[in-house]
Design a protein with these regions (language model features):
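Double-stranded beta-helix
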Residues: 2-18, 91-130
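A short glycine-rich, His/Asp/Glu-containing loop-to-beta-strand
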Residues: 12-50, 54
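Short, surface-exposed charged micro-motifs
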Residues: 37, 57, 66, 81, ...
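Glycine- and acidic-residue-biased ligand/ion/polar-headgroup-sensing regions
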Residues: 52-66, 70-71
């Protein structure tokens, strides 16, 4: 009988950052993907942006998300999935009275926060500003 040895790799999941719209924490940070838990406070929204080097997949886990994709607005509920290909302009907004929480999975060849091209930002941030 063949023995299977599983190597457990410890991932630093303690990275947490607050932003004007809410917060995020890293759940997984690898060369091939990055996974974040993102919380958007009531009445807040992220910048309208796009990326050159990564796709994103959002799974809504709490609340209702108002999502803009290339100037078209959609509503997503808990359990629904938003697929965002690189180059797609996108934004998520929380118009509800409770926190919006979603899991973001990034795939591509670069996941740095400097791969954000901001088109519009409620907080006056430039493209490479957090």
């Amino acid at each position: 009988m063949e023995k299977h040895i599983w190597e457990h790799k410890k991932v630093n999941t303690n990275y947490y950052e607050e932003r004007p719209w809410g917060s995020f924490e890293h759940l997984l940070d690898e060369d091939y993907c990055k996974v974040k838990r993102i919380i958007v406070k009531p009445g807040q929204r992220l910048s309208y942006q796009y990326h050159y080097k990564r796709d994103e997949c959002w799974v809504i886990v709490q609340g209702k998300a108002t999502v803009t994709l290339d100037d078209k607005v959609f509503t997503y509920l808990e359990g629904q999935v938003v697929q965002i290909e690189y180059g797609t302009k996108h934004r998520v907004q929380n118009e509800e009275e409770e926190d919006l929480i979603f899991i973001e999975t990034q795939t591509g060849n670069y996941f740095g926060e400097d791969d954000i091209v901001r088109i519009e930002d409620d907080y006056g941030r430039d493209s490479n500003e957090n």
